[in-house]
Swiss-Prot record:
Signal peptide: none
GO cellular component: cell envelope Sec protein transport complex; cytosol; plasma membrane
Keywords: ATP-binding, Cell inner membrane, Cell membrane, Cytoplasm, Membrane, Metal-binding, Nucleotide-binding, Protein transport, Translocase, Translocation, Transport, Zinc
Cofactor binding comment, as recorded: May bind 1 zinc ion per subunit.
Name listed for the protein in its UniProt record: Protein translocase subunit SecA
Region (Disordered): 855-879
GO molecular function, one term: metal ion binding
Swiss-Prot/TrEMBL cofactor(s): Zn(2+)
Residues reported in the UniProt entry to bind Zn(2+): C880, C882, C891, H892
Enzyme Commission number: 7.4.2.8
Pfam family, one: SEC-C
Membrane topology type: Peripheral membrane protein
CDD domains: DEXDc_SecA, SF2_C_secA
Length: 896
């Protein structure tokens, strides 16, 4: 009541926003005579003037009126298009970081040039986001003359570009591309191995076209970069055959190749064991004669040996796992229950599979992932435009903090939206649609029939073929071809069947596309020939208007009112006539699930017969209520996805920030020293627990681990025997001093710059490996966390708690692994230090899958987009394909 009274007194929020912006429109219009008087050179010089004024302290808001007036004049001179006043308002809404709802045909592509130009003045870049590659290329080419006239550069990004081309494209002032491509490039940049490998600049300002499609419909599934794990089955099998030849050391001082630590569930090679396994590896031709297992090029081989040793020494059949249906299934050590689907990480599961002689599975691992919600919220400023956003205004505000401003049309809307017709059966409904299409054909009125699925569009196509009605079918598969067909859907008598997303972004012009007709003329066509084409188009245009404009037929109500409005919005552009009607049946999915009982009983009471429709406001209201319920359900699903992804997003930001800072470092000494101190402290605390009695200490095990894992000779038992009053802190200091001394020897051999390069490569490589394993662990946690609800626990809180625990564990393991590798690997030349970096770069060339599974029902035609690069497998002892002359394992295959 009170809110209604306030609206009557002051107007709605939308009306107040429009009134405020009308004052700015007057200011822009006041600049128009001045702009018209400028020469082309003077007009082009405005950009430099604006940049200087911005650098001298003027804000973009203060420059807005003059900048918009400049763009409008340039657009008129280059494209012959002058921005309407309502388009200026749309540009202001976008500049303020909100969503402009503009009807179909109101010129959203042209509107984007206003805020794009204004924000490009800052020099920090503008990203314009489209729904497909065709629109990115089309819009960039179409608007390019405006930007280039004003001295700005324009880039466009698409999947098949080379790395260098993409870097150049991102350097442009204004970049066009798809949401998927921007997201994948962000993820790839955070998998890069050096700053020079990155392509994106700062995420400054994004203008998202069809914002409802991108930020809502496609937001239910994340972007994922996954890579098939290297097929190392043969290597696991070969190393598995060597491990039984190693002998366990039963007691300290006895002969033996390895020791076991049951407390930590670890197995370590002794000095004799290192020599023995090197000898066995050489005989198996996995290691060159005289080559050390600890050479930089053999890090991954060492990893396989450790995994196989652990599988044989520490993991036992029917205790730690069982073998069932040719698979190794883990047994939970606490409950004794099997855990199908769970796998040990770091190659251990594959090593156990090799030991048991079952098939070795190579998993498709997630390398990086992000949701669109979290990706687009990283931009300093985000805005969007669409023809249908108001029904989702609450979600835009809640998730993205974006206000929806409904922009009035330039000309009054005269489209006639007819009431829904509801039939008892689908057969009756489709027969009625055929009759409507046939009647339109008699009048030569163009028809667009919208369907909710490819299956429905193909079924309808078959019915039209039986009736000998010519038509075109669009299924949202070939964007460029679609755009051409949809542009011609306004020709007299044209019949087009389209799934809801097909051809979105292209206007249906009554009479067909004049631009396409002119483009089909020969390059040297005379003005007279062009005039003939224009007259023919005008004749067709007038014929369609006389027939009633474009007819929209909906074959089924969608789950979202917004998608229905998008279909209706195809007609009635820029004041054109048009009409729309939805044909429904009680057998349609939405009606069957949500509204059939109520509407069905109503139809029975009215004595409806097969073939007779019902047309009533109560029916329309019942359907809209069903749609509201479903919209609320889908919002809850997306909100829940975001709640969970926010936990992962916090961790992602920490990892990516750390990764970028490490890449930027020239000297990593401080980072490594900090890691070393933490690792040594943690090791001592494990074997000599704080606040414990000396009887609880295990100094020999500590010495063994330091020797076997880190190559540090620390006689901890001797220190304790000589000084019974020695404290754990003193032991830590002694061990740390030995670790520093041991490492300083390596530094002296090759120099600090070389060692820093090697350290950086190892840190990044290890970080990527552990992050990948962590993502898999987070996926597993997410899949089962809802079961905590049965124990009266909040699954989200439990997920946060356990995710934090996993993250802490991952960071601890990361530090341990980095220090272990740096301490044990031998670096003799600068070339050794570059081996890891070269191999990591080669990883980028290997097979990588980019996925965005759009499970949203709103885009029924979309499928998983998977891009693959297939390459022949290279053997470890084959010549490296880079042409160095070395074996693959000693060059780019060193860590594979």
């Amino acid at each position: 009541m009170l809110s209604t009274l306030i609206k009557k007194m002051f107007g709605s929020r939308n009306e107040r926003t429009l009134r405020r912006m009308e004052k700015s429109v007057m200011a822009i219009n006041a600049f128009e005579p001045k702009m018209q008087a400028l020469s082309n050179e003077e007009l082009a010089g405005k950009t430099q003037e604006f940049k200087e004024r911005f650098n001298n302290g003027e804000s973009l808001d203060e420059l807005l009126a003059e900048a918009f007036a400049t763009v409008r004049e340039v657009s008129l001179r280059t494209l012959g298009l002058r921005h309407f006043d309502v388009q200026l308002i749309g540009g202001m809404v976008l500049h303020e970081g909100n969503i402009a709802e503009m009807r179909t045909g109101e010129g959203k592509t042209l509107v984007a040039t206003l805020p794009a130009y204004l924000n490009a003045i800052s020099g920090r870049g503008v990203h314009i986001v489209t729904v497909n590659d065709y629109l990115a290329k089309r819009d960039s080419q179409w608007m390019k003359p405006i930007y280039e006239f004003l001295g700005l550069t324009v880039g466009v990004i698409y999947p098949d570009m080379s790395h260098k081309e993409k870097q150049e494209a991102y350097k442009a002032d204004i970049v066009y591309g798809t949401n998927n491509e921007y997201g994948f490039d962000y993820l790839r940049d955070n998998m890069a191995f050096s700053l020079t490998d990155k392509v994106q600049r700062e995420l400054n300002f994004a203008i998202v076209d069809e914002v409802d499609s991108i930020l809502i419909d496609e937001a239910r599934t994340p972007l994922i970069i996954s890579g098939a794990a290297e097929d190392s089955s043969e290597l696991y099998i070969k190393i598995n055959s060597l491990i039984p030849q190693l002998k366990k050391q039963e007691e300290e001082g006895d002969e033996g190749d390895y020791t076991i630590d049951e407390k930590q569930k670890q197995a370590h090679l002794t000095d004799a064991g290192h020599l023995h396994i090197e000898e066995l590896l050489t005989k198996a031709k996995l290691l060159d004669p005289g080559e050390s297992l600890y050479h930089a090029s053999n890090i991954m081989l060492m990893h396989h040996v450790n995994a196989a040793l652990k599988a044989h020494a520490m993991f036992h059949r029917d205790i730690d796992y069982i073998v069932k249906d040719n698979q190794v299934v883990i047994v939970d050590e606490h409950t004794g229950r099997t855990m199908p689907g769970r796998r040990w990480s770091e190659g251990l599961h594959q090593a156990v599979e090799a030991k048991e002689g079952v098939s070795i599975q190579n998993e498709n691992q997630t390398l990086a992932s992000i949701t669109f919600q979290n990706f687009f919220r990283m931009y300093n400023k985000l805005s969007g435009m669409t023809g249908t956003a108001d029904t989702e205004a609450y979600e835009f505000q809640q998730i993205y903090n974006l206000e929806v401003v409904v922009i009035p049309t330039n000309r009054s809307m005269i489209r006639k939206d007819e009431a829904d017709l509801v039939y008892l059966t689908q057969a009756d409904k489709f027969q009625a649609i055929i009759e409507d299409v046939r009647e339109c054909g008699v009048r030569r009125q163009p028809v667009l029939v919208g369907t909710v699925s490819i299956e429905a569009s193909e079924f309808l196509s078959q019915l039209l073929k039986k009736e000998n009605i010519k038509h075109q079918v669009l299924n949202a598969k070939f964007h460029e071809k679609e755009a051409q067909i949809i542009a011609e859907a306004g020709r007299p008598g044209a019949v087009t069947i389209a799934t809801n997303m097909a051809g979105r972004g292209t206007d249906i012009v009554l009479g067909g596309s004049l631009a396409a007709d002119l483009a089909n003329l020969p390059a040297d066509a005379s003005e007279q020939e062009k005039e003939v084409v224009k007259k023919e188009w005008q004749k067709r245009h007038d014929e369609v208007i006389a027939a009633g404009g474009l007819r929209i037929i909906g074959s089924e109500r969608h789950e979202s009112r917004r998608i229905d409005n998008q279909l209706r919005g195809r007609a009635g552009r820029q004041g054109d006539p048009g009409s729309s009607r939805f044909y429904l049946s009680l057998e349609d999915n939405l009606m069957r699930i949500f509204a059939s009982e109520r509407v069905g009983s109503m139809m029975r009471r009215l004595g409806m017969q097969p073939g007779e429709p019902i047309e009533h406001s109560l029916v329309t209201r019942a359907i809209e209520n069903a749609q509201r319920k479903l919209e609320g359900h889908h919002f809850d699903v997306r909100k829940q996805l975001l709640d969970y992804d926010n936990v992962a997003n916090d961790q992602r930001q920490v990892i990516y920030t750390q990764r970028s800072s490490i890449m930027a470092m020239t000297d990593t000494q401080e980072v490594v020293e900090m890691m070393r101190e933490e690792v040594m402290d943690s090791l001592v605390d494990t074997y000599i627990p704080p606040q414990s009695l000396e009887d609880q200490w295990d100094p020999q095990a500590l010495s063994d681990v330091l020797s076997d894992e880190f190559k540090i000779k620390a006689p901890v038992p001797d220190w304790i025997d000589k000084d019974h009053s020695i404290q754990p802190e003193q032991i830590k200091e002694k061990i740390l001093a030995l670790a520093i001394e041991h490492y300083d020897e390596k530094v002296r051999k090759v120099g600090r710059p070389v060692i820093s390069q090697f350290e950086k490569s190892i840190i990044l490589q290890t970080l990527d490996n552990h992050w990948r394993e962590h993502l898999a662990a987070m996926d597993q946690l997410r899949q089962g966390i809802h079961l905590r609800g049965y124990a009266q626990k909040d699954p989200k809180q439990e997920y946060k708690k356990e995710a934090f625990s996993l993250f802490t564990m991952m960071l601890d393991n990361l530090k341990y692994e980095v220090i272990r590798i740096l301490s044990s690997v031998e670096i003799q030349t600068e070339e050794d230090a570059h081996v890891v970096e070269e191999q990591r770069r080669a990883e980028q060339i290997k097979k990588m899958n980019l996925m965005h599974e759009n499970l949203s029902e709103n885009d029924e035609a979309s499928e998983t987009q998977t891009f693959r690069r297939q390459e022949k497998k290279i053997g470890r002892n084959d010549p490296c394909p880079c042409g160095s002359g070395k074996k693959y394992k000693a060059c780019h295959g060193s860590l594979v």
